[in-house]
Each structure stands twice: as C-alpha cells, then as structure tokens.
C-alpha cells in the first residue's frame, strides 16, 4: 500500500484501475531537460566531459592550422559563467536568459627552420564566444523576454535505405529499385535502376551517372567489378570441337538445354526440357564434375576476364564482351585453354552491372574522376588535382562527411554486419589502399577489406534479384528524434566553422605580428548563429502557455517539419498515417487537425529516446508464461523480434499468464499465442497515448476522431478564477501539474515558518541542511498576477499554514488551473441531456444564469500595452501629462509624469500614457492662423500621440513599468517604482537574514544551555547557563560568554562566524540587486523611454464563447437563461447546462455519458459526507463510509486506501475536502465498469439508471420522460467572443487599391466579396450595389465628400471612379495596351 504525502492526504482519488502500476509516470519534461543538460555538461569536470554537445562541436572544429602549417590553435576546455540577470529580470526587461561561454584555447607556433616541427612558443588564453541560452527549470528558454520552447524533430535517420518507385516512373509499371546513403551531414549518395536494368548513381540528387563510373573512380577495373558482383563459370576449350564446363549443378536450375544431359549412359534431362530442383539433386548425387557441351552453348556468354594470346600478348577479347563464333575460333587458334564467363540468368541472377559497363564511356580512373567533377561543377575546367580533391571531399573526409554513430550503426545493420561501430566516413578497401597519407593507412589497418559502397550495391542487386526486401521509411526504427541539445550543437558547429575560415586567414599573420588567441577569434558568427536558431528557427516556438497541460504537451511535441525535415505540401498520406511502431512511442490520438495532421505528434506517456535518438517504450519481461516486474525499454528495431502481450492480459496470483491463447502483437500484426511464446508484456494500459489523451476519462468509449478533438481542446482551456478538480479524472492529474512547474513544490522538508500571499518561508529539517553557510531556510517567492504568452493570468496561491510539517516534494502553492496540486482545467457542472426550445440546436450550449453569478467561468486576462518615446528628426518625443487639445477629464487618471495610476479602471479610448510628438511646420488653416494670432505660438508645435486603450477593451491597471535609457534622467514615476522595488528586495533580504539568524541562535542555545561558564555578562566563574539567563541577554552579548566546555566554546565561535559570513553575503547580494534596479535600461536604438502598462480584464462567460467537454463535445454558448427557467429536479436543484442529446449518437463519444453518471455518483457521495459532518456523526462512522467508498471491492492492494494511516483530525480534514464530491480516477483503457458505476450510484442513494425526472422551470410541469443528468467537467476554451467581435468606424486603407484593410488587428472592415455582389445583382439593388463598390470602399473623393455631407447634415452621396479601376487601367497599360477614358 502507498503511504500518502501531506498534500495527498488532503484529498484522495478513488481509483478504479484493475492493473497494478509497475512504473510511475516518468518526469514528463525529461526529453527537453536531459537533452540540453547533455549539451551544456555544465556540472561535469572539463576532463570528464563526454563527446557530446558543446564539447563535441569544439573538438570537431579545433585544432585549426594555418595554411602553411606553422601555427595552430588548439582547444583546451570551456566553462560557462554566471547569468547576469535571473529569469524574472529577463522576462521583465525583455532580455534573453543566458550565460557567457568562455573557451580556453592554446596558440602554438612552430619553428620554421627546424625540420621536426619544434615548438617556438605557446600561448594559452580564455576567449569569450558569446552567450549560450540557458534552459529554465521547466524546459523553456527566455528569448527577448518571452518564453519559447524548442520542439523536438522526428527526421529520417542517417544510414542506408532501400526503396522502389511503386511502379510510378515507367509506363510499364515495372518496379525500379533504389538505395540511398544518407549521412548526418554531407552529400547524399543514391543508386537506382533504370527501366533497362542498368544501374546508375546520383550524388546530391544531381544528374545520374552509370554506377561503374563511381566504382572506377574508387580504383576498380572492369574485371574487378565483375568479379565482385558475379559468380564465374569456367569453360575448358577443346582444341578441335566442343567445350568442357566445370559443373556446379545448382547453376543449371531453370535452364533449358538443346542437348541431352547424361551421366555416363543414363540420361538425366532430355533436350528441350527445363531443369528442375529434382534434376539438380540427381546430378549432385551422381557427382558429375564436368559436362561436355557444344560450342554454341558458350557463344553469347559474357566474359569475366580479358582473354590474351599467351605467346604474342595480343588482346583477343575484353572482359564483359559477349563471346561470338569468330572469337571462339581465335581462342582455339591461340591455344587458350580456359575462359571464365559470368553466371547470369533471367530468374535471380540479373546481368545488371554488365549492362551498366556497356553504357559507361570511361576507361580509366582519371576519366571517371573527371566525369564526376563535370557533373558536380559543370562549366569549370577539370584538372587532375581538382578532380581528385573533389571526389575525396565528397565522402571520405571527416570535415565534409559524417555518417555519425547512429548512421554507422544503421548502415552496418542493414548491410548485414555484426559490428555496429565503425568510421563516420564511407570506407572502401581499394580506394584507401591506393592513398598513402597517415589517415588512410590507419583506416586500412583497422578495416582491411570491406567496402561500404560495394556492399550497398550488392544488397540492392540482391533485392532486384528477388532476395531481400525494401525498407519502410515510416517505421520508427528509420526515424529518429533530434532534441534541443542536438540541434543547438549543430547550430553551434555551423557558427564555429564560419569562425574557422576567418581564423585560418589570420593565423598566418599570428607569428609575424604576435597576435593573441583573443585577437584571432571573432565570436560574432557563433553568437549570431545561436541567436538566430533560438530566436527564429521554425522549431523554436512561442510557448503555448494557456494552461499547465498545454505547456507540458508543447514540450513533449515531436514535429516532422522544420529544417532537414518534411514540408506540409510534400508530405503524403503514408508519413502522416499511424504506423504499428507508433505503439507506446508516439501518441496515436493526439495530432492537430488541418494541414499538419500526422506531421506533428506527441510523445506517449512512457516513451523516451535512447542513446541513438530512437524512441523506446518500456515492457515487462515474461519468462515461460511468468510475468516479472523487470522493465526493459525496447526501440522499434529491437521490438521486431519479440512477441508482446497487452497490459490487460489475465494473470493469476503468481503472475502467470492464465489464458490458453494470449492476444499479442508481433511484427506489426495482432495474433494469439500460447503463454510460453510470449516474451514481453505492456507496462500500462495508457502506454499508447500521450499525456493529453491520458487525461480523458473513459477514452476507451470514445470514437478516435472525437478523442483527438478532446485531447486537443483540453490544451485550449482558459484557467478560471477558482480552479475545480475534475470529479472524474484518470489519476495522472497530479503528475501533470507537478511536472508542468506551475505549482510550488518543496525542495526540502521542514516546518512552515512564515507565510503571506506572495511568499512562503520554510525552516528546513536539521537532517536536510547542508554544510558550510547553508542556514536551513528556504524562501519561495510566489508569482502574482503575471501575464502568460496567451494573455491569461498566472497566479499562485499558498496551500499551507504556519506550523505545517511538510516533506520534500509537497505542494506548497497552487498555480493556474491546479487544485491542491492536481490539474484542474474547467469546472464540474450539473448537466442535463435534453433539447430546450431549439437553444441547443447543432451543438449550442444553454447556460444557467447561476453559472455567471457564481463566476464559475470568469477568467482574468492580462493585456500588455506599450508606449515608446523615440528621438525623432524634429526633436525628442516626450511622455508627460501636458497634452494639447485634451480635456481635463481625459487626463484625470494620469499622474504628473503622464502615466496612469495603478488601480485605475479604464475603458476603450482612455489615455493610459500621455505622449506628445513634435510636428513639422505645415500649411496652416485659417482657423489655426486665428488661434495662433490670439494665443501665441505654443499650441501647434506638438501633436498628441498618447497610448490609448484599444477599442473593445476595458479593465483595471495592475502594473506599470517604466524603462529609461542610460544617461537620461528618470522621471518621478520611474523613481517611485525604483524605490518600491528596492524596498521590496530589502524586506526580502532582511527577513531572510532575520530567520537565518534566529535559526543559528536557536541551534546555539541548544548547545550551551546547561553548560558551565567561565565568565560573561553578569556571570561568575562556574555558573551554569540557563534559558532564563539567555532570554535576558542581548543577542550580541551571547558571544561574550566564556565557556568551560571546549565544544560549547567552539559552538559560540562557529555561530559568530556564520552570522558574520551571512551578513557579508546578504550585503553583497543586496548591493548587486540594487545596482541592477537603478542602472539604466538597454533599449532599442532611438528609444529614450518605454512605459509598459498591464491591464487586467475580467471576462465573464457570455453567448458566443466556445466551451467543450473532454470528449470532443464542443459547442458555443447560445443563451444564458434565468435560474428559475432552467429544468429542475425533484429536490428543487436546477441544472447548470443543457446539452443536446443528438450530439452523442452520430459522434460516438459515449465516454461523456459515462462521465456524467460517475460524476453524479461522486457528487452524491460528497453530499452524504456533508450530511454526516453536519450531523456531527462519530468519526468511526465516517471512517466506515469512506472505507465503503474506497475499498469495497478492490481486489488489488495498490488501490486500497489504508485509512489507518489517517489520524481522526486528518480524516475529518479529508472529509471536509470531499464535501464537493469524492474525486474518482478511471484510468484510460482500464477504467470503471458499468457495474462499478452502478454500485457508486447506489452508494450515493441515486437511481442506478443515471436518469431522473426533470420539471420545466417555466411551467413547473414534469417532462415526458426521465432525463440523463449528472456532473461533467466542462471547459471554457480560449476562443472568446470578446476577442473576435469587432466593428470598424473609420480606419486604415490599403495603399494601392485604397480599399479598407481586413481583420480585427488592422481595425479592418468586412469584405463584400463576389458572392455578395451576385446577391445584390440578383435582387437588382443597383444603388445599394453602387454604394458598396464606390463610396463605401475605394472611391476616395466620394467617401471624403460623403463624410463632409454627413457632418453638414446632408445625407446624399455622389459615386465617382473607384480606385481599383485605376489600378486595372495601370495593369493593362503595363501590358503595353493603352486605355483612356472619355467623357
């Protein structure tokens, strides 16, 4: 049985799961956090760092040598500094959170004169290489003040892949096979067949060349190529007539001979008959070694070697020639004894390479190299050196080509080698044996006679011959995950390579001019590459911060898009489809609807990546039908060999599989196997789904399409004012809330010392206090009312009280959408399924007014508005309250600096920050001239450019931040903000110090009370120190005590030192903070001052808002009805929401109905507990009832709740927390059965049918039949009508067409499109149509005139020429057709 933590004891979920949990839900952000930790290797000592991340990138680029080789720059190590600003300061100031990277490099200069490369001198130095972004504890990055997430990428693994064109290339439908070697970086190498069965190669998808050119470039001759790919038949030529064949019987199979095949006198095969496997066996039994065949049997065969006249040295025939009768005669004449021919046939030994050699124009290695050079660099004149270098650099140098460990492992496995290790370049025995540099010699020594390129071609020809299969590129063994760390490393390497080029140039000057490493290295390219990646890469995304679940899901997302991946347009159906290998690795449900469907996936709950980046999923081992608790992670490649049972396979008490045949998966198929043949078993029923899908209760009763919508819409739920835990959950709510990082969890156990709304102070347990200056106090500052990326409100509320004893990991404070440490996305609403006057037609939702009154779905949104004062050509803009032509009333919310007060309630159009801009001299109107004459000059030289509240927004100002450029005097408001911030920090530090001091004195007291003193204030020698004496003593005088006991004396001295050390440390930290607060801000060029105003907007639920359950049952609120009109139950309780029952059957999401039944039972049980508490029943009675709920029929110990762990007080506290309903957990695919739901309804004294009689609120009459009623967890989604509703008055126009812009952001109009024009034409409403097409759109004069007419009170219009017609005329003129309009 589990023991419960302090938080969990407050409220326990009843679990309906039948399966024992073998594995806890892992840390959900591990894929991000671990990946980046390996990239930085920050806490690893420099000499122990693995070949990963920054270290690997630096090692691969250094050492850099000069062109002459007389100077080199070597890499020693690196270290990361401390970040200047912490996360909170970066968010506030709009900076990036990162740390400086300092790399130690060594400049070595060699002596030119010496022949042995003697070192002249060495200089070692630290070089700054830019800022490296740091990851926050929650797996995000702060870039320019906003939180971003780097999404992992699922890309095609490096290695070799075999495929065919599915018969699409050639009209005959013939399958053309191809192979492709994909490196991690470097050129792709393709091999492909053409319809005539010749074999070609392509480099980097360029034009194709016969494959023999590539082999010739490697150094192979025709004879060697043929010997590699074909077996050889040897024929002995008789001097006069006939030929003897050295017989290998197997090679005759399938042939038809035109002569009898006999063993001595016995004919085995008659002429004209096909030779079968039976004949072959007979031949083998007979032991026939040679076969006499006629000459015409040899004619037409292909020679495997050149044939030379032994006496004269004359070439009689070339390898790969077809033997003709003349040649045969020449062989006889020259006395050639034997010739070799290629063994080919049409069945399974195609003459592919032989065909290829016939179309190959080259004869020598040099010609082949030149041909490749021409293909890669068309138009450049080839030289021998250039051609050789180009070819070598393509596949054989570590700088340009890298298969990577993954690629090498996949390559070796695919071509059938046992060893998974090897070189990261392509190796070829022939090519490297001919080179004589050190690197080549090493390779030849290590790998002897293997050849990567030859083996790929061999496997390809085998597949073409019908032996072997092509690969499935959507198999997860062929796709790997690239996470943050790896992508950052690649980008960093790219930056370093750019630096390398510049350094090489300068190194030659280094020795003559005595340059230092710092002068050699320019860090800009590295910094720029990293900044570009984190700021604007396709995979660096603005974090979805709607609620905790959306954050977690965003970080666990796996995308097939992005650099080096697919594009939406090119991706076909196969890539997007669910593949059998997705099981337990990638969620089969959660993916976006729309163009990205299937390209963006989510990791399954238990999935993780292995060292190669392939996804693995855990399984329990099964031995001879016995299931163990040993867990093994398998990748898709390894899983192929095993038979795997489902998590719910039946087992007995001894963990033996009980069924005669167990449902299993094997190689992507589902089948039944006896227990003895099962190797593994799933760990958990929710293994296949992602976090979001695992939060949907009764998911197993929902159609997959609706489950997908349900999983996706949970991510859009807006955090409500008061979160409510779901009555029906799945049991992983706590894990999601914990790992999302929105709650505050205790880092160490202890006692709550002090608490207020904004922070919690914990005095740490003695046992957990570290040594040194650790004083054993943890201070947690809570986040109050800050804005998320999606403008929702992030706020944390304390859950503990002073004196509570907490353990490590306990939840101290709730964040948005969490309730006592559990994820709580919506509210539990009483729902009835019935039509109601057409107000819930087509998925509309009918709400009760009570929901609005109780603020159940009221959400707070925080809008950030920014006002920037710039330096303009005509002078600086100024932020002030002195604005021309504005009434006093409009300024009454501003202070003397022109900035709005905190707490002011503002509406659309109100001034928030007063700002004036100098304006140039312009033509004055007569009225302005008059004003000038009367009032003098001042009125006209500035214009009002204040920040106003945008249309459609109103709210309360909750925060103002003023940023001032360095060297510009701060205004009064900025100084006030600064002072209050300094005060806050000072109070924080003072409190910390006070608590630390108290803790130190308390420890000291325990060490000296009762000990004998030698002297001190008012103490004689030999007196004993007492508590009362210490209480009367000033704290600072404690250190005057002289103790007899040495330990006590030491304790006093130690305490004094500790306090002094802390005092110093706090002073230094406070000075640092103060400096940061008072320093000027780093603003964009030309900006003098920036003011940010934060508005809190309260949004109540209203018609037009989108809501949804967790089963894809979404709808729009159609009406809010008074409570008294809503249907009500016999108890008088009216329902909150009425949904249409027709939304259920066709969509097949029955999970919502089961949720409603179980939710009703949960609420009913809560009501019973409430009645018990109100009647002040005995605790034993409550204990018995809770035991009935939690432990009635649970066979599995894991879910039994051991109520004996709870004291009476804790039990009453638990009871109080259950009044709102007893939360239930029905895990995915392992949930509550119908019988269990019925039992719960019975226990709650509710009808087992889950239906009850409702009465019409308006008439009081009973409805015709009973209605399904119950509680459902219902969400309000972030698609609010307030954000979408919009109306244009007068706004901006498009520059060219002069038509109004579109969209709310541009304050645009509504498009009157072609269909609407047709409608008016059909009605014959000519004048309305003219008005729409001219003055209401783009007739500039007409619309100005109309405006004037309306001002003058004349309501008439004159339509002129629309601007778009002028555009048309201009476009026609651009085609050189003149068009003029005549009156």
Swiss-Prot record:
Q: EC top class, in one word?
A: transferase
According to its UniProt record, which reaction does this protein catalyse? RNA(n) + a ribonucleoside 5'-triphosphate = RNA(n+1) + diphosphate
Which one Pfam family would you cite for this protein?
RNA_pol_Rpb2_6
Q: Which GO terms describe its cellular component?
A: DNA-directed RNA polymerase complex
Q: Which GO terms describe its biological process?
A: DNA-templated transcription
Q: Which UniProt keywords apply?
A: DNA-directed RNA polymerase, Nucleotidyltransferase, Transcription, Transferase
Please give the Gene Ontology molecular function terms for this protein: DNA binding; DNA-directed RNA polymerase activity; ribonucleoside binding
Query: What is the role of the protein in this entry?
Result: DNA-dependent RNA polymerase catalyzes the transcription of DNA into RNA using the four ribonucleoside triphosphates as substrates.
Q: Please give the HAMAP family that the UniProt record associates with this protein.
A: RNApol_bact_RpoB (MF_01321)
Record family assignment: Belongs to the RNA polymerase beta chain family.
Its quaternary organisation is: The RNAP catalytic core consists of 2 alpha, 1 beta, 1 beta' and 1 omega subunit. When a sigma factor is associated with the core the holoenzyme is formed, which can initiate transcription.
Name of the protein this chain belongs to: DNA-directed RNA polymerase subunit beta
What organism is recorded for this protein? Xanthomonas axonopodis pv. citri (strain 306)
């Amino acid at each position: 049985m589990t023991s419960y933590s302090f938080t969990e004891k407050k409220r326990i979920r009843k679990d309906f799961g039948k399966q024992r949990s073998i594995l806890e839900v892992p840390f959900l952000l591990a894929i991000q956090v671990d990946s980046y930790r390996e990239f930085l290797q920050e806490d690893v000592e420099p000499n122990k760092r693995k070949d990963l991340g920054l270290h690997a990138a630096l090692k691969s680029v250094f050492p850099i040598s000069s062109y002459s080789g007389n100077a080199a720059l070597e890499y020693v190590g690196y270290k990361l500094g401390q970040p200047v600003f912490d996360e909170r300061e970066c968010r506030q100031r709009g900076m990036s959170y990162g740390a400086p990277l300092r790399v130690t490099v060594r400049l070595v200069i060699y002596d030119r004169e010496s022949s042995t490369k003697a070192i002249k001198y060495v200089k070692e130095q630290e070089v700054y290489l830019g800022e490296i972004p740091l990851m926050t504890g929650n797996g995000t990055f702060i870039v320019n003040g906003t939180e971003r997430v780097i999404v992992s990428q699922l890309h095609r693994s490096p290695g070799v892949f075999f495929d065919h064109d599915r018969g699409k290339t050639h009209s005959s439908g013939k399958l053309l096979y191809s192979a492709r070697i994909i490196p991690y970086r470097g050129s792709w190498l393709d091999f492909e067949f053409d319809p005539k069965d010749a074999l070609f190669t392509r480099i980097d998808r360029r034009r194709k060349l016969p494959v023999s050119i590539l082999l010739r470039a490697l150094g192979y001759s025709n004879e060697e190529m043929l010997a590699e790919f074909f077996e050889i038949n040897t024929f002995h030529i008789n001097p006069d007539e006939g030929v003897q064949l050295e017989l290998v019987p197997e090679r005759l199979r399938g042939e038809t001979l035109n002569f009898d095949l006999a063993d001595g006198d016995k004919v085995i095969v008659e002429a004209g008959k096909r030779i079968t496997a039976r004949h072959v066996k007979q031949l083998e039994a007979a032991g026939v070694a040679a076969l006499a065949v006629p000459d015409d049997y040899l004619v037409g065969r292909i020679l495997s070697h050149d044939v030379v006249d032994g006496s004269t040295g004359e070439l009689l025939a070339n390898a790969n020639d077809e033997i003709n009768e003349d040649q045969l005669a020449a062989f006889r004449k020259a006395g050639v004894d034997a010739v070799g021919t290629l063994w080919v046939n049409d069945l399974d030994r195609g003459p592919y390479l032989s065909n290829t050699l016939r179309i190959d124009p080259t004869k020598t290695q040099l010609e082949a190299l030149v041909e490749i050079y021409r293909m890669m660099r068309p138009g450049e004149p080839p030289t021998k050196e250039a051609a050789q270098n180009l070819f070598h650099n393509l596949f054989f140098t570590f700088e340009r080509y890298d298969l990577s460990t993954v690629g090498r492992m996949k390559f070796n496995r695919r071509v059938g080698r046992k060893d998974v290790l090897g070189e990261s370049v392509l190796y070829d025995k022939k090519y490297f044996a001919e080179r004589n540099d050190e690197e080549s010699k090493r390779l030849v020594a290590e790998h002897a006679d293997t050849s990567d390129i030859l083996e790929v071609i061999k496997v390809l020809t085998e597949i073409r011959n019908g032996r072997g299969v092509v690969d499935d590129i959507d198999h997860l063994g062929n796709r790997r995950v690239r996470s943050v760390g790896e992508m950052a490393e690649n980008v960093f390497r790219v930056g370093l390579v750019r630096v390398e080029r510049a350094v090489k140039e300068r190194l030659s000057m280094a020795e003559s001019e005595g340059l230092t490493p710092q002068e050699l290295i320019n860090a800009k390219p590295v910094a720029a590459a990293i900044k570009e990646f984190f700021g604007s890469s396709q995979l660096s995304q603005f974090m979805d911060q709607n609620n905790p679940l959306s954050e977690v899901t965003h970080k666990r997302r796996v995308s097939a898009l992005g650099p080096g991946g697919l594009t939406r347009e090119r991706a076909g159906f196969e890539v997007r489809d669910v593949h059998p290998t997705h099981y337990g690795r990638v969620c089969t449900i959660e993916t976006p609807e729309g163009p990205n469907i299937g390209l963006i996936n989510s990791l399954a709950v238990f999935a993780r990546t292995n060292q190669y980046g392939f996804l693995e999923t855990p399984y329990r081992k099964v031995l001879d039908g016995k299931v163990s608790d040993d867990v093994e992670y398998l990748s898709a490649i390894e899983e192929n060999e095993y038979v795997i049972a489902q998590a719910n396979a039946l087992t007995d008490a001894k963990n033996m599989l009980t069924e005669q045949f167990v449902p299993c998966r094997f190689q992507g198929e589902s089948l039944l196997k006896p227990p003895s043949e099962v190797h593994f078993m799933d760990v958990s029923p929710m293994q296949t789904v992602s976090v979001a899908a695992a939060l949907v209760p009764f998911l197993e009763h929902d159609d997959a399409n609706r489950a997908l919508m349900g999983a996706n819409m949970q991510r859009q739920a807006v955090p409500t004012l008061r979160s409510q835990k779901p009555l029906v959950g799945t049991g992983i709510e706590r894990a999601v809330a914990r790992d999302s990082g929105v709650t505050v969890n205790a880092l160490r156990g202890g006692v709550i010392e002090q608490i207020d709304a904004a922070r919690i102070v914990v005095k740490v347990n003695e046992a957990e206090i570290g040594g040194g200056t650790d004083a054993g106090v943890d201070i947690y500052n809570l986040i109050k009312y800050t804005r998320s990326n999606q403008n929702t409100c992030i706020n944390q509320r304390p859950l503990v009280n002073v004196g509570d004893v907490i353990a490590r990991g306990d939840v101290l404070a709730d964040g948005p959408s969490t309730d006592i440490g559990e994820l709580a996305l919506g509210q539990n609403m009483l729902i009835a399924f019935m039509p109601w006057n057409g107000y819930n037609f087509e998925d509309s939702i009918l709400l009760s007014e009570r929901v609005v009154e109780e603020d159940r779905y009221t959400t707070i949104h925080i809008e950030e508005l920014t006002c920037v004062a710039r330096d303009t050509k005509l002078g600086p803009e100024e932020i002030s309250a002195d604005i021309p032509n504005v009434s006093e009333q409009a300024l009454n919310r501003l202070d003397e600096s022109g900035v709005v007060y905190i707490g002011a309630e503002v509406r659309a159009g109100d001034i928030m920050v007063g700002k004036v801009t100098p304006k140039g001299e312009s033509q004055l109107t007569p009225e302005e001239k008059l004003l000038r004459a009367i009032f003098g000059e001042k009125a006209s030289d500035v214009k009002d450019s204040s920040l106003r509240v945008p249309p459609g927004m109103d709210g309360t100002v909750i925060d103002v931040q003023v940023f001032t450029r360095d060297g510009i005097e701060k205004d009064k408001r900025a100084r006030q903000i600064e002072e209050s911030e300094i005060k806050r920090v000072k109070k924080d530090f003072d409190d910390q110090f006070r608590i630390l001091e108290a803790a130190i004195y308390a420890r000291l007291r325990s060490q000296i009370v009762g000990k004998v003193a030698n002297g001190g204030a008012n103490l004689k020698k030999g007196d004993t120190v007492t508590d009362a004496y210490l209480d009367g003593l000033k704290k600072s005088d404690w250190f005057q005590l002289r103790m007899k006991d040495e330990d006590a004396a030491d304790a006093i001295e130690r305490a004094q030192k500790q306090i002094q050390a802390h005092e110093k440390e706090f002073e230094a930290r406070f000075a640092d903070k103060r400096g940061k607060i008072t320093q000027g801000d780093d603003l964009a060029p030309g900006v003098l001052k920036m003011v940010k105003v934060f508005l809190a907007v309260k949004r109540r639920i209203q018609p037009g808002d989108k809501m949804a359950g967790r089963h894809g049952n979404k709808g729009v609120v159609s009406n809010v009805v008074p409570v008294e009109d809503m249907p009500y139950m016999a108890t008088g309780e009216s329902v909150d929401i009425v949904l249409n029952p027709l939304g259920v059957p066709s969509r097949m999401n029955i999970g919502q109905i089961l949720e409603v039944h179980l939710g009703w039972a949960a609420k009913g049980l809560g009501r019973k507990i409430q009645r018990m508490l109100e009647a002040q029943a005995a605790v034993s009675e409550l204990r018995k009832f809770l035991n009935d709920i939690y432990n009635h029929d649970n066979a599995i110990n894991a879910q039994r709740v051991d109520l004996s762990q709870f004291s009476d007080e804790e039990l009453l506290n638990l009871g109080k927390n259950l009044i709102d309903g007893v939360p239930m957990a029905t895990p995915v695919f392992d949930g509550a059965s119908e019988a269990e739901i019925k039992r719960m309804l019975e226990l709650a004294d509710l009808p087992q049918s889950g239906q009850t009689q409702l009465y019409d609120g308006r008439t009081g009459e009973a409805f015709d039949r009973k209605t399904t009623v119950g509680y459902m967890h219902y969400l309000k989604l972030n698609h609010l009508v307030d954000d979408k509703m919009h109306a244009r008055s007068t706004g901006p126009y498009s520059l060219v067409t002069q038509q109004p812009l579109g969209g709310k952001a541009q304050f645009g109009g509504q498009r009157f499109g072609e269909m609407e024009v047709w409608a008016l034409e059909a009605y014959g409403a000519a004048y309305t149509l003219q008005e729409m097409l001219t003055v209401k759109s783009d007739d500039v004069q007409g619309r100005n005139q109309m405006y004037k007419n309306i001002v003058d009170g004349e309501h008439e219009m004159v339509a002129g020429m629309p601007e778009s017609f002028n555009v048309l005329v201009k476009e026609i003129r651009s085609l050189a057709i003149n068009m003029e309009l005549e009156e």
